[in-house]
Amino acid sequence: MNEELKDLTPKQTVAELDKYIIGQNKAKRAVAIALRNRMRRLKLPEEIRDEIAPKNILMIGPTGVGKTEIARRLAKLSGAPFLKVEATKYTEVGYVGRDVESMIRDLMAVGYTMVKSEMQEKLKEQAEKNTEESLLDLLLPGSNKKKTAATSAQPQDVSQASSGTTISLPSVSSTAQAEEHKAQNENDMSGTREKFRVMLRENKLEDKMVEVTISPSMGTPTFEFFAGGSNMEDIESAMSNISSMLMGGAKSKRKNVSVKEAREIIMAEQLDRMVDHDKVTDEAKQRVEQMGIIFIDEIDKVASRSDRGGGPDVSREGVQRDILPIVEGSKVSTKYGVVDTRHILFIAAGAFSVSKPSDLIPEFQGRFPLRVELEALHAEDFKRILLEPKNALTKQYAELLETEGVKIEFLDEAIDRMSFLAADVNSKNENIGARRLHTIMEMLLEDISFNASEMGGETVKIDVAYVDERLKDIVQDQDLSRYIL
């Protein structure tokens, strides 16, 4: 488990989220407390620990205000397995489409990949040494003393001596000469190997062609059991794996590649061979069960409005009912084993522009006791978004263009103008929140981005006049802004 989590207080969590997300303090506090409570639970005695379930969160707010970003940053901050899904992609069990249990299988796959990467990172130094030796073996066959020692030091066949066959032993002088010659050859090969080692490290042999043997994946064979409504892609993938095992598995193949490509292939194979896959599976399963986070977006789209007539909708109320046992706690079969969902944190989010949270079935509402309403963004918020976050849009575009030698400077007056225009367009058209800034920045810098390769060494100052020249006519023409911005 991630030990650093134990020292992350709610205040520290909010402070970290503030580096990337502007405003929405209520939502930040809610997720920070939820994260801290998980660490508190892990410190309790086992008999009490199992009784404490996470308090799932329902985020309510218009699009583009930071719902998804809060959950994503929280997962990165905690090092917990995180999965974002859209509620609209699932259908009721028994109908064509993905069943809701597949989100647990996907989360387990995320956890496995995360833990495997961490373990491989710890083994990377040794794997690099092994890879270097393997490359030298390919470039200079027979130059590895360790590998050739066994074959060069083989004794005479004992069976010949016991059968009475006369064996002519070489004279002492000829033996000494042979040993001297052998030692000379070994020294020469050793010197050549070291020269090649230096050249490898200096990347002077990257284009040289070598023949490598590509082995099939070293992963542990796994089986997965599916419910009746499982996705056909999952079933086909599982059947393909089973068929491969029954047929004796995938075969190794030889391929001519450059040293650069061979290094990547051998490195991946070394890491895969060195890592303990059973240990990875156990650790990943523990992390998913104790620290996993699933963010269910567009939950408002599966809320059936009370004024809506017609029969049951398999992608609405049925999906809510199928999610209930997973949120409450059930055991889901995956190819890595059975996963208990009791302590996975679920964060559901939706704009609820057409429906209301009360349109969700009562049982579903009860599984998400914490409700947080996110506020709509205004011009002042947009200004802060353009300037304050570590990954602010203005910083991103400036860094992108600087790769071509073009320096961009955004004046404060230009930032104010862009913020006002974003808020103005949002108020007149669909309110898409901070995502409007992406469109405005693209339109604003379109000419510079297109001609950047010919503007090396130039400095461009973005002021109010430039912003108005590029955007004012589009913003004022409501019909045009609806289609362009």
UniProtKB/Swiss-Prot annotation:
One of its GO terms (molecular function) is proteasome-activating activity. Keywords: ATP-binding, Chaperone, Cytoplasm, Nucleotide-binding. Its main location: cytoplasm. InterPro entries: AAA+_ATPase, ATP-dep_Clp_protease_ClpX, ATPase_AAA_core, Clp_ATPase_C, HslU, P-loop_NTPase. GO terms for biological process: protein unfolding; proteolysis involved in protein catabolic process. It comes from the Bacteria. GO terms for cellular component: HslUV protease complex. Coiled coil: none annotated. HAMAP family: HslU. A double ring-shaped homohexamer of HslV is capped on each side by a ring-shaped HslU homohexamer. The assembly of the HslU/HslV complex is dependent on binding of ATP. NCBIfam families: hslU, PRK05201.1. This is ATP-dependent protease ATPase subunit HslU. It comes from Treponema denticola (strain ATCC 35405 / DSM 14222 / CIP 103919 / JCM 8153 / KCTC 15104). The gene is hslU.
